């Protein structure tokens, strides 16, 4: 009653919420006080991924990744077993890691700091933060053009091997990136498109982040 009498605006701050129950609760508050402002703020921004997906596919959302389908997973700075893009990927990842007929998914992680995903990878390649963008660029070049570089540095060799495995797996391969840069996110989507990846599900989008 005091709030109503004072005509003060009540600000309710939440993360991006796709939950019907949360939306109903906010609506009830608004009915009661009539001056509720609902502000959605994501502590971990996914603007780069949202911008990239919107540019390539016309929808501002995050795609889903069915890692159970993957034979080869290459991550460049994406802790997808942590809270990357809202999390929730570990169950289907785990299913793909169970040997079936002597086969299981292969996971290669390029990262600067140890992560849960890196700890579970078959191959973890340590890269500097400044090298992560170049790693994606070289992966794209290797998959589209067939080679990385004439200079056989340990990183270039690792990238070439990863690209070879991605191409061999084809539609059963996927590249993920946690680099907060629109161009890097576009590169990852372009690589998956070149691979005809079935793991990347562009029609099964998630609206769990707005920015």
Regions found by a protein language model. Name each.
Residues 1-211:
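Cofactor-pocket helix-loop regions in the catalytic cores of large enzyme subunits
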């Amino acid at each position: 009653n005091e709030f109503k009498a004072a005509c003060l605006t009540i600000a309710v701050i939440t993360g991006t919420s796709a939950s019907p129950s949360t939306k109903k609760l906010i609506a009830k508050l608004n009915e009661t006080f009539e001056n509720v402002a609902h502000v959605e703020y994501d502590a971990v921004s996914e603007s780069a991924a949202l911008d990239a997906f919107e540019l390539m596919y016309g929808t501002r959302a995050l795609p889903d990744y069915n890692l159970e389908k993957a034979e080869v997973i290459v991550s460049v700075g994406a802790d997808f077993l942590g809270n990357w893009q809202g999390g929730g990927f570990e169950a289907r990842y785990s299913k793909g890691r169970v040997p079936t007929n002597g086969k299981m998914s292969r996971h290669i992680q390029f990262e600067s700091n140890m992560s849960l995903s890196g700890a579970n990878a078959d191959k973890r390649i340590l890269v500097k933060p400044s090298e992560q963008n170049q790693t994606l660029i070289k992966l794209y070049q290797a998959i589209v053009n067939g080679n990385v570089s004439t200079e056989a540095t340990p990183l270039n060799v690792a990238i070439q091997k990863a690209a070879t495995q991605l191409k061999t797996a084809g539609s059963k391969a996927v590249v993920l990136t946690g680099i907060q840069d629109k161009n890097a996110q576009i590169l990852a989507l372009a690589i998956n498109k070149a691979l005809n990846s079935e793991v990347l599900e562009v029609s099964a989008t998630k609206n769990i982040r707005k920015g």
